[in-house]
Curated annotation (Swiss-Prot):
The record marks 58, 61, 64 as: Contributes to dimerization. Its main location: secreted. This is Fulditoxin. Postsynaptic neurotoxin that produces potent, and completely reversible, postsynaptic neuromuscular blockade, as well as broad spectrum inhibition of human muscle and neuronal nicotinic acetylcholine receptors (nAChRs). Inhibition is potent or moderate, depending on the receptor (alpha-1-beta-1-delta-epsilon/CHRNA1-CHRNB1-CHRND-CHRNE (IC(50)=2.56 uM), alpha-4-beta-2/CHRNA4-CHRNB2 (IC(50)=1.8 uM), alpha-7/CHRNA7 (IC(50)=7 uM), and alpha-3-beta-2/CHRNA3-CHRNB2 (IC(50)=12.6 uM)). Acts as a competitive antagonist of ACh. Belongs to the three-finger toxin family. Short-chain subfamily. Negative results: weakly inhibits human alpha-4-beta-4/CHRNA4-CHRNB4 and has no activity on human alpha-9-alpha-10/CHRNA9-CHRNA10 and human alpha-3-beta-4/CHRNA3-CHRNB4 nAChRs. Homodimer; non-covalently linked. Is able to form a tetramer of dimers in the presence of 2 zinc ions. The keyword Metal-binding applies. Disulfide bonds join 24-41, 34-59, 63-71, 72-77.
Length: 84
């Protein structure tokens, strides 16, 4: 019984891939699993003409600075309007 329990624990850990499982938004509705080395989620503003802008949602290792940007390190945290 102990062997079965140990096997289930090992299989669970392998399936979860604990070392690389951060999930971030890649658009307003789509999500992605971040590649190795990218340990933060980010939403940053890209300026257009006449003072308008749009947001880029992505995984990153280094976040952009800016008043409207979000940089965080927990799953699906880059959709909010505040950093976390």
């Amino acid at each position: 019984m102990k062997t079965l329990l140990l096997t289930l624990v090992v299989v669970t850990i392998v399936c979860l891939d604990l070392g690389n499982s951060l999930k971030c938004y890649s658009s307003r509705t789509e999500t992605m699993t971040c590649p190795e080395g990218e340990d933060k989620c980010e939403k940053y503003a890209v300026g257009l003409m006449h003072g308008s802008f749009f947001f880029i949602y992505t995984c990153t290792s280094k976040c952009h600075e800016g008043a409207y940007n979000v940089c965080c390190s927990t799953d699906l945290c880059n959709k909010s309007s505040t950093s976390g």
